[in-house]
Regions:
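Generic hydrophobic alpha-helical membrane-span motif
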Residues: 48-49, 114
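Short His-Asn-centered micro-motif
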Residues: 38-39, 55-56, 85-89, 107-108
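Extended, acidic-biased charged interface segments
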Residues: 100-125
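Short hydrophobic/aromatic residue motifs in ordered secondary structure
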Residues: 45-46, 111
């Protein structure tokens, strides 16, 4: 099953919000909870499956940056019912990244029930 990644809202105090961005009204629901923050990159949100990959939109048009991503995804043995989501930084957007370890940065992995796996699995805690 192919699943569209939902939009991530900006924090209310973000300085880079555009007219089509969603933003949180408040951050009060984070008070007293452990949170993990990551840097927002200027790329293309992409999902990798064992036999398929797509941008955030399930029907996104073909682009050379997706060819690179497909080549990357076939190098790994992704479990049948899982998907790996991350930012595809291969194509140049408003920011041109250099000196990256990879043009694909993973930010979440989802199981067959569409549950996001705990980051504790990936980070030494």
């Amino acid at each position: 099953m192919k699943i569209k990644y939902s939009r991530t809202p900006h924090l209310p105090f973000s300085q880079s919000i555009t007219s089509d961005d969603k933003k949180l009204i408040s951050v009060d629901h984070f008070i007293g909870k452990e949170i993990i923050m990551s840097e927002k990159r200027d790329g293309e949100n992409s999902s990798l499956y064992r036999d398929y990959n797509h941008a955030r939109s399930l029907d996104s048009s073909d682009h050379i940056s997706q060819h690179w991503l497909k080549g990357l995804s076939i190098r790994y043995d992704i479990p049948e019912d899982c998907r790996i989501c991350g930012e595809n930084l291969y194509a140049k957007h408003s920011i041109h990244y250099t000196n990256l370890e990879s043009y694909f940065e993973v930010f979440s992995i989802w199981n067959e029930k569409n549950d996001c796996l705990s980051p504790n699995i990936f980070f030494n805690r």
